[in-house]
Amino acid sequence: MDTFVTKAARLNGPRDIELIERELVCGEDDIIVKNHLMGICGSDKNFYRGYLPPKTAEFRQDPKFPFLLGHESGGTVVAVGSRVADYKVGDRVMAFGWNNNFAEYFAAKSFQLQPVPYDLDMDIASLGEPISCAMYSGLNSGVQLGDTVVVMGGGFAGQIIAQCARRKGAYRVIVVDVLEGKLALARRLGADITLNPGQDDVIEAVKDLTNGLGADVVVEAAGTAESFNTASEIIKHNGKFVFYSWVTTPVTLNISRWHDDGLEFINTCLVHHTWQQRYVWCPEALRPVAQGLVDVKPLITDEFKLDDIKAGFDLADKDDAAIKIVFRP
């Protein structure tokens, strides 16, 4: 069995991250991948701050410290086990699993990877998981020609979803965020209107823009109680409430409108589908990116070497305007 020694990130406690040396053994069902690039997810940022996730099927390690961190990455297969039939050495792959991906190398099972489609640039393909998740949300949001669409949250996913809504024929795309830098980027990438809850009355603004009716579609991509409650107030009667965010703490919601106005709820979390469904959806979700219809490169705001992982996470912790921070081995 092939053995690889790798630097890998370990989170020992809140804001206590270090690189350790791990030995990866390629078992008969394993695939070893040499990383090209890794990204910090919003969930990684929460973990860094000490908010570990609840126990779910997504996590095959207990959510407790020390925690082996990382899931957004892509690279090249360098070893496969004797029972692996789906991949071979030299294949370019995208990670779809929590396998301590902040590392030079990581080990995965076949169902935790996706082939890189359309000869995508590896910088983009290495972020294939968050990109395809956001694109899946945008493509399945129910946006129709002429709709007014509000995206709550101008982070990595929100920026992609907003672009997707525009390409699907939305008449008006509104992005809501508390950071002016994110709103400026949203305008540059095609949003018609941006609103800052710290300065604007979002509910009144959306009502004014829609003659009192409300938005046809609201996508919640911020993940806060305030965002969910605002979203509930700005959707029109029989409008579409699209869930994207992963909310890991309880929130208090006013749900009377959900019933009274017959809102339609659409859950658009790709990673919670089976891996067989992801094999179908990932190429479809990434095709508009490969075609140049959705621009993701401006969303990569900061780059570090893996050796500087502490500096990268400190930036993510302190500067919410850093939309996507990436590391190279």
Residue map of PLM features:
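Glycine-rich cofactor phosphate-binding loops and adjacent beta1-alpha1 units
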Residues: S141-V143, L189-I266
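A glycine-/small-residue-rich N-terminal strand-loop-strand element
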Residues: G74-W98
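C-terminal hydrophobic helical "lid"/dimerization subdomain
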Residues: M1-F4, A8, N229-S232, W281-P329
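NAD(P)H dinucleotide-binding glycine-rich loop of Rossmann-like/cofactor-binding domains
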Residues: F59-H71, R92-M152
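Mid-domain Rossmann-like dinucleotide-binding core that forms the NAD(H)/NADP(H) cofactor-binding site
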Residues: I124-Q199, E204
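Short, surface-exposed secondary-structure boundary micro-motifs
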Residues: H36-M38, V80-S82, W98, G154, ...
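C-terminal substrate-binding/catalytic core of Rossmann-like NAD(P)-dependent dehydrogenases/reductases
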Residues: K207, T252-D302, K310-A311
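N-terminal glycine-rich cofactor-binding segment
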Residues: A8-C26, G42-G74, M94-G97, Y118
